[in-house]
Amino acid sequence: MTVDDRTLDTLTGEVVDLLQTLIRNECVNDGTPESGHETRNADVLRTVIEGPSVEVETLKVLPGRDSIVARLPGTDPHAPALMLMGHTDVVPVSPDGWKVDPFGGERIGNEIWGRGAVDMLNVTSSMAVTFRHIASSNRRYPGDIIYFGVADEEAGGGYGAKQLVRDRWDVLECDYVLTEYGGSPVVTNDGISVLLTTAEKGVCAQRIVVSGEPGHGSMPYRTDNAISKAAEIVRRIEDYDPGPRIDKLFESRIKGQGFDAELEAKLLDPGRVVEALAEMEPGLARNLHSCCHTSFSPNLISGGTKHNTIPDRVELTVDIRILPGETVHDAQQHLRDAIGPELMGSTEIEAIHDQTATESSTDSPLWSALTDAIQMTYPGARVLPSMVTGGTDARFFRERGVPSYGAGLLSADISLGEFMNRFHGHNERIDIESLRLTTKLWLDVLDRLWN
């Protein structure tokens, strides 16, 4: 639905107000069942999107952790349905690192500050305002439009999309999904590239149990100390290199970044990519390294019973993110290779998560609609597929064969590196122009999808 500038200004103002409210509701998800309190945001979103032509259903998994879904019926029952999906929870903060109240939702200049401003209450808000605008205008498209405001994305979706896609497909059924994250314009010598998400790495966290022999802490000589062995295992995992994989998705990402020819050549060479990354800005280097490697991060360790007792058991949790095409068995074999046979004799490996990587093809009407819509704002822009190294709720839909893309459209004032650093970081914020462009994107996509 094409709108004039005045209408877009009004909608943007509504997005700003809604975003501020969602931030102030402080729906912090620390991973425990009793956290999140997403019902606060679900109730607000309900008041925004419900109306005479819209029925909103509350989806309950746990008390206080509501999700909501609403469907705007299309005119053609055979036309594909599009879901606009945004999560309503945010991650915890360290207040001492913030310049402002992280849950104040303050407007400072042309930016809205607060936890969730980029992850992803900005998108959740713009989608809700877009959905309400379409419903109130009485404009109908061939296919259904679904709004899904979902809880618990930040802790894996067990109380949100993961369970609801499994148990409530009757209300969530769709043919396409738009969600986080994407839309950063990258200025290159050849013009502008805009990266959208078509894939995400798999999560294969593993628990490593290291065994030893107990003894008195005053006599450590020639003892079998489980902590000492665990420390060596951590060192070996840190040093382990599974080798890079330069696939078409990574190649597309590199060619769209606008690097100079020499750096681009290094990044696309398996023998030189790590050398090239070592010379780059750390934030971008970390992201690109993870996009072409299976990654291993030892993040939790526990063991020992008393200061004077040699420990006989240590548990170590390693966050492993695998590339498309790899399995949990591949992840465990990497660990065995890293640890080595002499230490594997006193080590057990157990899978905690077994989530394979997911990827959607760009050969779809929705991708074409996104490309056309983005080029209305950034004429001639190359719209390129990319992979996120973390997880989103899109994976649960991709597993059902539903093409799912992470989208949005940011202003040129936010670099890709800065945008990535704001996720889960201090002083999270979004500029109002990006809220305007993202809202316009949804409207432009809807005008093009069924054409």
Language-model segment annotations:
Residues V123, R140, G149-C204:
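Hydrophobic, small-residue-rich alpha-helical packing segments that form membrane-like cores
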Residues T2-P95, R313-T317, V328-Q332:
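N-terminal helical capping/dimerization or prosegment-like subdomains
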